[in-house]
């Protein structure tokens, strides 16, 4: 199996996939996360990266988090990133990820995709949190 992990952040999903023998490619713009491909998701061309069995995208949740009560929300930037992720997800497999309690799923460009959303409990796969 092959996993393309967009906005991979901590890489917890990819670590689990690799531990089960999957080939993974992580993409993130933050060099501190040490992704396989250091790139901006908005500039990622899926046609240059082959086929993947599963594509996971987790744009930064701070733009949509309900837990972020003291910080300013930048829905415009968050929407840019989630639209880029959606473009790539649609190219491959039309699957996506968003924390179950976040605002991303109610943004206008995501409403049409809500019937395909499911909850993934990463804590069941070795991560210290649920998404």
Across the structure, where does each feature detected by a protein language model lie?
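Extreme N-terminal starter segment of soluble prokaryotic enzymes
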Residues: 1-3
């Amino acid at each position: 199996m092959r996993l393309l992990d967009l906005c991979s952040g901590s890489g917890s999903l990819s670590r689990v996939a690799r531990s089960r023998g999957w080939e993974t490619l992580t993409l993130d713009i933050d060099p501190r996360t040490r992704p396989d491909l250091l790139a901006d998701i908005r500039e990622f061309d899926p046609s240059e990266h082959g086929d993947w069995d599963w594509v996971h995208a987790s744009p930064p949740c701070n733009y949509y988090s309900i837990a972020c009560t003291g910080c300013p929300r930048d829905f415009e930037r968050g929407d840019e990133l989630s639209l880029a992720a959606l473009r790539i997800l649609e190219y491959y497999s039309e699957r996506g990820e968003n924390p179950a309690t976040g605002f991303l799923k109610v943004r206008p460009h995501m409403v049409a995709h809500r019937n395909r959303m499911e909850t993934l409990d990463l804590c069941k796969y070795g991560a210290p949190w649920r998404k």
